[in-house]
Curated annotation (Swiss-Prot):
Name of one Pfam family that matches: Importin_rep_4
Each HEAT repeat, start to end: 219-257, 361-399, 402-440, 444-483, 866-905, 908-946, 949-987
Protein name stated in the entry: Ran-binding protein 6
Keyword Protein transport: yes
Position of the signal peptide: none
GO molecular function: nuclear import signal receptor activity; nuclear localization sequence binding
Keywords: Acetylation, Coiled coil, Cytoplasm, Nucleus, Protein transport, Repeat, Transport
Main location: cytoplasm
SUPFAM superfamilies: ARM repeat
Tagged with keyword tRNA processing: no
Membrane-crossing residue ranges in chain numbering: none
Organism: Homo sapiens (Human)
Function according to Swiss-Prot or TrEMBL: May function in nuclear protein import as nuclear transport receptor.
Length: 1105
């Protein structure tokens, strides 16, 4: 359009008419007309847009549809485009916009348009409050306050709508104007003449409380609004409006404490609405959501009202029965997604969450009898719902259901023969869920009955949907089934799977049906993955059929089957190994290459993509360096997938409501009626592709060198990819492997890559919000330091790292204090304690990663790092105080162990910090702490120098006491005990003047061999070699009397896989055996005391060392 009006120059009539026509074109049914109009609109300057749109909104002669479009565009312009447009408007235009907007809101007579103007008003007000809370539109706030004090109901509605849309509109004045806010909300929520006012005031009150979620004092002041809010919830639901109920759900989720004074009323109302079949499904589900959400966010409060929860359970179960008699279900060839809008699915999810929230002690007694009655019903819907209820409560009622698991499983197994296919499918689903919830005990206890029953169900050719569910349950069962148990059934299982495969393959060829076949190939893959080399005898049975499926499945609707079959082939190849797989390797690689070529020309969301990415990685593992020739064909699409950028948007809540659930977007409410959205399709594929790049860098090393620059430039920015945790994990994991690859190209290239990686990696440690991802980042940083070595961090890096680690340690102590406070609160119970323990485990895990980073620094920098470390010293000393929890003491001692091992003799200057903690913790009840202390005493002897002599002398009796303890060799204690034995060996070897060697040596020899701690075991064997090679009389014994014992120690070392042929110690031990063999009598005496396994172990040692 020609419109070019500028500041101070009014638009001409023709320009306005052109713009109105443009607005009409934007709502034209013709796609082409709309697209042209959108292009013209986008090119109009922001000033012109603002003035034209505001004029159009106010012009009642323009027509409602045009005004509506103008309002939507102006709201969007002042929302997402505010920073680009409004600050660049001349001051007089900004003033005019604010004045015109107040007038427009005040004078508008059309109710719907007035709401849209209020939306625009709220958006502008939100953007005119700065970060300090200062309101730069005082006239707008004055208008709002005047509206509150007026007697005009329309102006009340305006004030409420703006306040609901932007509850922070008062800014810094809020504290002083709380009475005004409360007056507005109170007078409107009591208004019996105007239901719309009452509803809107309840929503505004909820929005205000949510906006002040951390202001506990405000909850008390505004608590007397709650009865009005609850009444508005009730009334609005029966007027077909669920908006206030949605607000109540938000309160339950974010500020449950606000509901405290009226919690029983809230629960009773929710129970009533949930059970009222006159209401819509959504309203009933929202009412149930209030109860379920409170079970998660206010568990202790809700446990005081278990009588209401007990009344809710029948309602939940009744909703689970709300199923349709769908005749097409039996013949469907697609496994449809759960309909989360249905009562049955929503109620099943609610029961699951309720059980997890309140625990089995509360929920199981409430549900058990109801479920048993449902399972006995003649109506299939009740039997189906009863089974799905059992499936839902398993995780939350885990501990309580263990004692009744036998009867429960036996009951569920009966329903695999139910006359109704939906019930049989539900029984399969329940068994699969139990296999997850009760693993691995479920597999160990029920393998015989469950495997046989699921295989029989798969053999039943009457219904492929049921077959598919049975196959899915078997896959889940196999995931946690020990290999030793699964191999017991492998013959019958293979026979069954192969016979079904043959039939399903024929059905695919004849009818194109694929559903059961998709699950079947995944089941075969799971079996191969679990039994590994035991699958070799069955390889030739399956591989031809699987390759045939890949060749056949070329149509679009068979892509998922093709992808799953490719995955299955790669799993089988990995299971049977390169030697067996090589007969088909070339053929399989050609199939993969053909699929890869097709994928390069297909949509980004092709279902084969993720399967292909994983399959290539397995082929790499199978073929090793032989895979290198295929890498150029694989890497480009992989990098393309890993580089994909997700669509993101910042939208008003109203825009979000207009978007379809099928658009693939997920939104997070940011408050103030704004939501952040991300299109999630493709994120999983991106994460998988990133993981595969890590894998190739790790496995191929020199074969990956030429791609390192491209990949590192991709991965480093992904450390801040907050849309998907696994992408950040992969980015972190890749760093040390990429550095290893870069080292092959030379030190200069390596240094350049480290310079690119180091700073973002350190910053990520400080900013990463997720504990699991943070641990991976910290682990990656520690490994990277070990790759780079001494001097890899400059002063700025060390300063930043020191600050971050200090903050992590201080946060660790602060979190422990907060947990102790929670343990003193009124609502503290076993459930709260479990939650606190989970938090503590997360904190301790991060502490272990702090220890890993310090270990890498001490091991590379040695004593040069100690001046930097001293800023952390008080915090590490605090960890080993006797009052600290045992994991703190364990990891604090480990850090000092590293200092002693890598920074001696300088480490002695810290001895007064750790001397007594090291000695006293030898008596600790926790074996992990004893192990850390014993290891420290051992490295003192080995690396500490003469200064540590007296401490080593003091340590010996303490170490001996632990070793001689009656339960020292139990599974729980053995690692700590073996570290004590190793420590005594180190004192004997490196500090012999601290102890009576001849007195201690016979005891030390009697404690050998070590079985569990391989690293310490090889050190003890090395010292034993020293003693034998020097013909130490105490070790050899009078008349060689100790040699049979020594030979048995060596044999056990081989059996326990302590002896590694690459270790020089292996050759020395073999030489000891050969030396004994030179005396036939002595050798026969030694051998006579060995069993067959020990003799075979010695022979193997002699053959290879």
């Amino acid at each position: 359009m020609a419109a070019t009006a500028s500041a101070g120059v009014p638009a001409t009539v023709s320009e306005k008419q052109e713009f109105y026509q443009l607005l009409k074109n934007l709502i034209n049914p013709s796609c082409m007309v709309r697209r042209q109009a959108e292009e013209i609109y986008e090119n109009i300057p922001g000033l012109c847009k603002t003035t034209f749109l505001l004029d159009a909104v106010r012009n009642r002669r323009a027509g409602y549809e045009v005004r509506q479009m103008a309002a939507a565009l102006l709201r969007r312009l002042l929302s997402s485009g505010f920073e680009e447009v409004y600050p660049n408007l001349p001051a007089d235009v900004q003033r005019d916009v604010k004045i015109e907007l107040i007038l427009a809101v005040k004078l508008e007579t059309h109710a719907s348009m007035r709401k849209k103007l209020c939306d625009i008003f709220a958006v502008l007000a939100r953007n005119l409050i700065d970060e300090d809370g200062t309101n730069h539109w005082p006239e707008g706030l004055k208008f709002l306050i005047d509206s509150i004090y007026s007697k005009n109901v329309v102006l009340w509605e305006v004030a409420l709508h703006v306040f609901w849309h932007f509850p922070g509109i008062f800014g810094t004045q809020e504290r002083h104007d709380l009475d005004i806010i409360k007056r507005l909300l109170d007078q409107c929520i009591q208004d019996q003449e105007h239901p719309a006012i009452r509803t809107l005031s309840a929503r505004a009150a909820a929005a205000f409380v949510l906006a002040n979620e951390n202001n506990i004092a405000l909850f008390k002041d505004f608590a007397d609004l709650l009865p009005g809010i609850l009444q508005a919830v009730n009334d609005s639901c029966y007027q077909d409006d669920d908006s206030v109920l949605e607000s109540l759900v938000e309160i339950a989720d974010t500020v449950p404490k606000y509901l405290g004074p009226y919690l029983e009323d809230t629960l009773q109302l929710s129970l009533k609405l949930c059970g009222d079949s006159r209401l819509s499904n959504l309203q009933r589900q929202l009412a149930l959501e209030v109860i379920v959400t409170l079970s998660e966010t206010a568990t202790p409060m809700l446990k005081k009202h278990t009588n209401i929860i007990a009344q809710a359970v029948p309602h939940i179960l009744a909703m689970m029965v709300d199923l349709q008699d769908d005749e097409d279900w039996v013949n469907a060839d697609e496994m449809e997604e759960d309909d989360f809008d249905s009562n049955a699915v929503a109620a099943e999810s609610a029961l699951d969450r309720l059980a997890c929230g309140l625990g089995g002690k509360v929920v199981l007694p409430m549900t058990k009898e109801h479920i048993m009655q449902m399972l006995q019903s003649p109506d299939w819907k009740y039997r189906h719902a009863g089974l799905m209820a059992l499936s839902a409560i398993g995780e939350g009622c885990h501990q309580q259901m263990e004692s009744i698991l036998d009867e429960t499983v036996n009951s569920v197994l009966l329903f695999l023969q139910d006359p109704h296919p939906r019930v049989r499918a539900a029984a399969c689903t329940t068994l699969g869920q139990m296999a997850t919830d009760f693993a691995p005990n479920f597999q160990k206890k029920f393998h015989e009955t469950v495997i046989a029953a699921l295989l029989r169900t798969m053999e039943n050719q009457g219904n492929q949907r049921v077959q598919s569910h049975a196959a899915s349950a078997l896959i889940i069962f196999i995931e946690d089934c020990p290999k030793s148990l699964l191999v017991l059934y492998v013959d019958s299982m293979v026979k069954n799977l192969h016979s079904v495969l043959v039939i399903k393959l024929q059905e695919l060829i004849r009818n194109g049906t694929k559903l059961a076949l998709e699950q079947l190939v995944t089941t075969i893959a799971s079996v191969a993955d679990t039994i590994e080399e035991k699958f070799v005898p069955y390889y030739d049975i399956f591989m031809p059929s699987l390759k045939h499926i890949v060749e056949l499945a070329v149509q679009k609707e068979l892509k998922l089957l093709r992808g799953k079959t490719i995955e299955c082939i790669s799993h089988i190849g990995l299971a049977v190994g390169k030697e067996k797989f090589m007969q088909d390797a070339s053929n399989v690689m050609q199939l993969l290459l053909k699929t890869q070529s097709d994928l390069n020309n297909m949509e980004d969301d092709d279902p084969q993509t993720s399967y292909m990415v994983s399959a290539w990685a397995r082929m790499c593992k199978i073929l090793g360096k032989d895979f290198q020739q295929y890498l150029p064909l694989v890497i480009e699409p992989l990098i393309k997938t890993a580089s994909a950028k997700p669509d993101v948007a910042l939208l008003d809540t109203q825009d979000v409501e207009n978007m379809s659930d099928d658009d693939g977007w997920q939104f997070v409410n940011l408050g103030d009626q704004q939501s952040f959205g991300i299109k999630t399709s493709g994120l999983e594929a991106k994460a998988t592709a990133c993981q595969m790049l890590v894998y190739y860098a790790k496995e191929l090393r020199e074969g990956f060198v030429e791609y390192t620059e491209q990949v590192v430039k991709l991965m480093v920015p992904l450390l801040k990819f907050y849309f998907h945790d696994n992408v950040r994990v992969a980015a972190a994991e890749s760093m040390p492997f990429l550095l290893e690859c870069a080292r092959i190209r030379g030190p200069e290239y390596l240094a350049q890559m480290w310079q690119f990686i180091c700073d973002p990696l350190i910053k990520a440690i400080g900013t990463e919000p997720d504990t699991d991802v943070l641990s991976e980042i910290m682990n990656s940083f520690a490994k990277s330091i070990e790759v780079m070595g001494d001097g890899c961090l400059n002063d700025e890096h060390l300063e930043e790292l020191g600050g971050i680690l200090k903050a992590k340690l201080e946060g660790h102590f602060k979190n422990q204090e907060l947990r102790q406070v929670k343990r003193q609160e009124e609502n503290y119970d076993q459930q709260v304690e479990m939650s606190l323990q989970d938090e503590d485990e997360c904190d301790v895990y991060i502490l272990t990663k702090v220890s890993d980073i310090l270990h890498s620094l001490f091991s590379t920098y040695k004593e040069k790092i100690l001046p930097w470390f001293e800023q952390l010293l008080p915090l590490i000393v605090n960890l080993i105080c006797s009052s600290r929890p045992w994991p703190d003491r364990q990891w604090g001692l480990c850090i000092f162990d590293d200092i002693i091992e890598h920074c001696s003799p300088t480490s002695f200057k810290y001895v007064e910090y750790f001397r007594w903690p090291m000695l006293l913790n030898m008596r600790d009840n926790n074996p992990e702490v004893r192990q850390a202390a014993a290891y420290g005493l051992g490295v003192m002897a080995q690396f500490g120098g003469d200064d540590y002599r007296s401490l080593c002398s003091e340590a010996v009796p303490l170490l001996v006491k632990v070793i001689k303890c009656a339960n020292s060799k139990t599974k729980k204690n053995v690692i700590a005990t073996e570290n004590c034995i190793s420590a005594i060996g180190k004192i004997l070897k490196f500090k012999p003047n601290c102890v009576n060697v001849d007195e201690v040596l016979p005891h030390w020899l009697s404690w050998l061999p070590l079985h569990e701690d391989k690293e310490e075991a090889i050190q003890t064997l090395s010292f034993l070699c020293d003693l034998i090679e020097s013909n130490h009389p105490v070790v050899i014994g009078p008349n060689n009397s100790n040699l049979p014992k020594i030979i048995s120690i060596i044999a056990e070392g081989k059996i326990n896989e302590t002896i590694n042929y690459e270790d020089p110690c292996a050759k020395r031990l073999a030489n000891v055996v050969r030396q004994v063999q030179t005396s036939e009598d002595l050798w026969l005496e030694c051998v006579s005391q060995l069993d067959d396994e020990q003799q075979e172990a010695l022979q193997e040692l002699l053959n290879f060392a």
